[in-house]
Amino acid sequence: MGRLDGKVIVLSAAAQGIGRAAAIAFAKEGAQVIATDVNEMKLKELEAYKGIQTRVLDVTKKDQIENLCKEIDRIDVLFNVAGFVHHGTILDCTEADWDFTMNVNVRSMYFMIKTFLPKMLAQKSGNIINMSSVASSIKGVVNRCVYSTSKAAVIGLTKSVASDFIDQGIRCNCICPGTVDTPSLRERIQARPDPEQALKDFLARQRTGRMATAEEVAHLCVYLASDESAYVTGNEHIIDGGWSL
């Protein structure tokens, strides 16, 4: 018996990083996973795992989300993972940077939740998990202005949905990681003028002396997706190795 036996889980940004680790962890616990991403080539790799189907999806496109929803008869868990990290202060952030970040990090969740929530309400049960960050309303982080703003909005969205539908069988929580060692992070480090120093800077702020792994975050994802967390809603779940202390 798996902890997620029989549950249908839809998640975004599943091709790599936390999304990929979560998709694999969900499937290993018995869930039927519909893994989505814009990266078709990387996404296809997940089809090697029993219990995982894949769909190419751009979460900023409302029509694509609606078409996916029509394909699915039932959904137990919606996990919104897709996100973009902009580096810089408010003075480094152009209007285009602002709009792109907000579209990927917040508007996509608005689209996903608004599309799939009616199906959950009809079932009288549903579980929504949103990916936020410690870099949000939890902690001010240097050079994360628009990113932190967007992730603070995710916390607000999470609490609002949880409050509005708590008496209709709906739960909504968000996950707030600190620094996680993912392909996305490694790409950002390599894009810096001095990648070696950038890596040292990331490690220096880790009170545990290391970054989290995507698999460690996936353990929390499994808990929140399972009935073990049935009494948990409207919360931001911090997993940051003590960075926010």
UniProtKB/Swiss-Prot annotation:
Record's subcellular location: Cytoplasm
One BP term from GO: siderophore biosynthetic process
Keywords, comma-separated and alphabetical: Cytoplasm, Lipid metabolism, NAD, Oxidoreductase
Record bears the keyword Oxidoreductase: yes
A Gene Ontology molecular function term of the record: 4-oxoproline reductase activity
Superkingdom of the organism of origin: Eukaryota
Pfam families noted in UniProt: adh_short_C2
SUPFAM superfamilies, per database record: NAD(P)-binding Rossmann-fold domains
Catalytic-site annotation from UniProt: 147
Primary location recorded for the protein, binned into one broad class: cytoplasm
Catalytic activity: cis-4-hydroxy-L-proline + NAD(+) = 4-oxo-L-proline + NADH + H(+); (R)-3-hydroxybutanoate + NAD(+) = acetoacetate + NADH + H(+)
Major enzyme class: oxidoreductase
Keyword Glycoprotein in annotation: no
Residues reported in the UniProt entry to bind NAD(+): 16-18, 37, 58, 151, 180-184
Gene3D superfamilies (UniProt xref): NAD(P)-binding Rossmann-like Domain
TM ranges: none
Signal sequence annotation: none
Enzyme Commission designation: 1.1.1.-, 1.1.1.30, 1.1.1.104
UniProt xrefs under InterPro entries: NAD(P)-bd_dom_sf, Sc_DH/Rdtase_CS, SDR_fam, SDR_superfamily_enzyme
Subunit structure: Homotetramer.
Family to which this protein belongs: Belongs to the short-chain dehydrogenases/reductases (SDR) family.
Record protein name field: Dehydrogenase/reductase SDR family member 6
Natural source organism: Xenopus laevis (African clawed frog)
